[in-house]
């Protein structure tokens, strides 16, 4: 799931903007 993946990245990188 791309949305789940982007959520993980968003949590892993603080201050990063959500991809979706």
Curated annotation (Swiss-Prot):
Q: Name one GO biological process term.
A: lipid catabolic process
Q: In which tissues is it expressed?
A: Expressed by the venom gland.
Q: Where in the cell is it found?
A: Secreted
Catalyzed chemical reaction(s): a 1,2-diacyl-sn-glycero-3-phosphocholine + H2O = a 1-acyl-sn-glycero-3-phosphocholine + a fatty acid + H(+)
Q: Under which EC number(s) is this enzyme classified?
A: 3.1.1.4
Listed GO cellular component terms? extracellular region
Q: Which UniProt keywords apply?
A: Calcium, Hydrolase, Lipid degradation, Lipid metabolism, Secreted
This protein's cofactor list reads: Ca(2+)
Entry protein name = Phospholipase A2 II-5b
């Amino acid at each position: 799931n791309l949305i789940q993946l982007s959520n993980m990245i968003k949590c892993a990188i603080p201050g990063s903007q959500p991809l979706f």
